[in-house]
């Protein structure tokens, strides 16, 4: 096989240490030379690792994406001008029965040396930092949804079926009623009806029927209040994250506005997309490769004339849900009915 990188390095990364193997292939021989060294993952030792690589004129490094342990190594080497390829572990998996830390780094380096390692997409630093915020926002929104469900279930077990009447348990009328039910006041039907607003006043009888016979212990009231406070706190944190994100994406406003011209994409979706794939689409080569990277394309798995599972992959953990949400919104878009007419 052709040697793509005459001088390169394979790195096996762990939580507390890494093993690096520099591979040098002489011009007059296909037999490579190996130099191995072990470093800790403290910044001082990572800089020594970078010094060692530069001393041997090794500017191409490959390591597998082991958890988050590769990130500090990548940060240091990137700052020192060393090109780092991050590989999916499934592409550099060592042969069973012949595996240890030293052999792993050598194996990774050997595969990389002859160009058999596919590089994972690593955006620039600004996009990576933005990605940390958007992914954290995704987690906060998930937590908020969990608290909403927990709040609703807390009333269900207390024989309150208000969620069967109102569309949103956190709407103005529903909030007023739930606050009243968890207060120390004795229940008064007339006062409860007076808390209803707008269209919900027409459902006053249904609201009372959904509440009639409820029983909430003091301990349950305390738990419900804690859940609400946590929900409100999460909402505040989401607003704080949004403020910070809007400051960070100021330089990408043109890209965001362009994305928002696509049916189904709003500002939040556009920011999520940019945070996941950046703004330079040359990284993917084609739209098909991008869809595959996002985990939206079916697999191709056939052996001996039998087709096996072709389900979509687990890739695109954060991008895929955003694009699926965009697709649902596009189908319901009345202003741009192309997808609505095509798929509904």
Protein language model regions, located:
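A detector of single, family-specific signature residues
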Residues: 1-344
């Amino acid at each position: 096989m052709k040697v793509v990188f005459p001088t390169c390095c394979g790195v096996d990364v762990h939580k507390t240490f890494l093993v690096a193997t520099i591979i040098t292939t002489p011009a007059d021989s296909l037999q490579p030379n190996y130099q191995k060294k072990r470093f800790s993952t403290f910044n001082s030792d990572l800089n020594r690792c970078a010094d060692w690589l530069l001393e041997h004129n090794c500017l191409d490094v490959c390591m597998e994406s082991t958890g988050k342990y590769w990130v500090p190594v990548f940060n240091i080497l990137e700052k020192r001008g060393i090109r780092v390829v991050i590989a999916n572990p499934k592409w550099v998996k060592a042969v069973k029965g012949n595996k240890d830390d030293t052999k792993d780094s050598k194996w990774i380096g050997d595969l990389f040396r002859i160009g058999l390692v596919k590089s994972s997409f690593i955006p620039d630093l600004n996009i990576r930092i933005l990605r940390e915020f958007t992914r954290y926002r995704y987690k906060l929104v998930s937590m908020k949804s969990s608290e909403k469900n927990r709040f609703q279930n807390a009333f269900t077990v207390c024989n309150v079926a208000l969620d069967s009447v109102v569309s949103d348990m956190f709407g103005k009328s529903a909030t007023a009623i739930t606050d009243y039910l968890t207060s120390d006041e004795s229940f008064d039907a007339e006062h409860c009806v007076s808390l209803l607003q707008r269209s919900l006043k027409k459902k006053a009888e249904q609201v009372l029927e959904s509440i009639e016979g409820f029983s909430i212990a003091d301990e349950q009231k305390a738990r419900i209040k804690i859940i609400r406070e946590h929900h409100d706190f999460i909402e505040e944190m989401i607003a704080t994250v949004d403020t910070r994100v809007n400051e960070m994406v100021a330089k990408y406003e043109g890209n965001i506005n362009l994305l928002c011209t696509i049916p189904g994409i709003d500002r939040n979706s556009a920011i999520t997309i940019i945070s996941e794939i950046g703004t330079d689409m040359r990284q993917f080569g084609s739209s098909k490769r991008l869809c595959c990277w996002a985990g939206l394309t079916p697999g191709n798995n056939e052996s001996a004339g039998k087709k096996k599972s072709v389900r979509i992959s687990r890739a695109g953990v954060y991008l895929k849900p955003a694009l699926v949400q965009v697709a649902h919104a596009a189908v319901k878009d009345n202003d741009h009915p192309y997808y609505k007419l095509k798929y509904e």
